[in-house]
A protein has these predicted regions:
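Active-site acidic/histidine proton-transfer and metal-coordination neighborhood
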Residues: 47-144, 216
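Acidic-and-aromatic substrate-binding clefts and catalytic sites of carbohydrate-active enzymes
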Residues: 9-22, 43-59, 83-92, 119-125, ...
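Long hydrophobic alpha-helical segments typical of transmembrane helices together
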Residues: 185-226
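A cross-family glycoside hydrolase active-site/sugar-binding cleft signature
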Residues: 8-10, 37-42, 78-80, 113-115, ...
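Acidic/histidine-rich catalytic cores of soluble enzymes
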Residues: 6-7, 105-193
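Acidic (Asp/Glu)-rich catalytic clusters
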Residues: 1, 18-38, 61-73, 96-107, ...
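Conserved, mostly hydrophobic/aromatic
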Residues: 7, 29, 69, 112, ...
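Conserved small/polar residues in nucleotide/adenosyl-binding loops
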Residues: 229-231
Length: 231
């Protein structure tokens, strides 16, 4: 009833979402008047897989994962986190891995992306910024980026600068703040929303991780702010 239209899940495990089957989860969301949009989940590579560059076994996990997400009605699967790799070779292996995951998602009618935090603005081997390397070495046909604008700012960078440097790569945005959206004043939302066409944005996801009031009021305040700036 507040005005939110879709849900992004973050609890996929062994074929289920929050302990529910894909169909049960889909029905629960739709009963609330919303649709299932996306999900945060991932499967990391072992040291052995990184050393060999062979991630065949890891892809078997994704086959089940993709099937469950498709059954739940998801449009997008997003990897929410990757620690800073020790070497550029390891980072390249992850880029190759993500390209293959994205290819499998595409074959199933889904899209695959990566969500940043602040640590991706560190350099790997003191040579390459992690996020830039990933943007440059993943295939836009298979991998989009879900920019978390709060973490970009916390990483001392400008979301709009990244929109201009890598146009069309940011299919989704995580709109987030220190607490309720818009309260800290540290994120320049006006400039961000004026440049969404350049970024390639199709969906905006509101995320509130910390609350200064009861959760229902917190998410309402965040939506009220977004509505105020005409989102």
């Amino acid at each position: 009833d507040m005005g939110y239209t879709s849900v992004e899940a973050a609890n996929y495990n062994d074929g289920k979402f929050y302990g529910k089957t894909p169909q049960e989860f889909k029905q629960m969301v739709e009963k609330s008047g919303m649709t299932v949009l996306s999900s945060h989940t991932t499967h990391g590579l072992s040291d052995e897989e990184l050393a060999s560059g062979d991630f065949t076994e890891a892809l078997k996990w994704w086959d089940q994962c993709i099937a469950a997400h498709k059954e739940a009605g998801m449009e997008y699967i997003v990897t929410p986190y990757l620690s800073v790799p020790k070497t550029l070779k390891d980072l390249q292996t992850y880029c190759d891995y993500y390209n293959e995951v994205g290819k499998r998602c595409q074959a199933a009618g889904l899209k695959y992306g990566y969500h940043n935090h602040a640590h991706e603005f560190q350099k790997v081997e003191d040579k390459e910024l992690m996020l830039d390397y990933m943007l440059q070495h993943t295939n836009p046909e298979y991998v989009f980026f879900q920019m978390d604008v709060y973490w970009v700012v916390r990483g001392q960078n400008s979301p709009v600068d990244y929109f201009n440097k890598y146009p069309g790569r940011f299919t989704m945005l995580h709109i987030k703040d220190h607490r309720e959206i818009g309260q800290s004043g540290m994120v320049g939302y006006d400039a961000i929303f004026k440049n969404t066409d350049t970024a390639g944005v199709r969906h905006i996801v509101a995320e509130i991780e910390k609350y200064s009031c009861p959760v229902e009021e917190s998410v309402k305040q965040s939506l009220d702010y977004l509505s105020l700036i005409h989102i």
